[in-house]
Amino acid sequence: MLAIVAAYLTFVGVGTFVMKRLPGDGFRFYGLSFVYNIVQVMLCSYMCIESLVIALRQGYTLTPCNTFDVVGAPVAKVLWLFYMSKVLDFMDTFFIVMKKNWKQLTFLHVYHHSTIFAFYWLNLNAGYDGDIFLTIILNGAIHTVMYTYYFVSLHTRDIWWKKYLTMCQMVQFGCMNVQAVYLLGSGCTKFPPRLTAMYFVYIVSMFGLFAHFFVQSY
């Protein structure tokens, strides 16, 4: 996990250094971007729907402290796919660097992509069932819309609902932390409490960065 994150950060540094010294506007990768965004929309929507189906079958509710099955772990397989999808998400940074879209290569972007991968490695090893289902549903839904936006942006720059996408992302973080606060406040021990506390702090940082981006952009 650490090796992959280190490789990602190395690419960001070295790739930026090299591309800024090359003449021209960078590579376009229209065909690859076209296919990539379609694949992401399909993958994210699948993970969202699959998690919802599992939640319904297992009788999970929106009230936190759902059953955590250590052995069967019905959510584990889709969480593994969710975790691996974060490797695919590194392509977002690849496109930004190779296209020289420097305005998009922000601290928020790099922080999000590097830390989310590490954080869900922890989930995959400790919080692989139960209440993690809600995160996959919310994140899968938001990313389905986000990659739809990226797909549309390949063809037009006039996308009126861009700011609403950012608002939805912040609502997602709010919902995640409501869940975390409930888990911590209720004394629920089915989902690892230490992981929940780390989750809460991390999501607060993400909400703050997205809120700052929203204020600066809109």
Give residue spans per PLM region.
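Structured ligand/cofactor/substrate-binding pocket environments in proteins
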Residues: 141
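Membrane-helix and juxtamembrane interface regions of eukaryotic multi-pass membrane proteins
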Residues: 1-138, 150-166, 171, 175-218
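Acidic, glycine-rich loop-and-strand cores that form catalytic or ligand-binding grooves
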Residues: 144
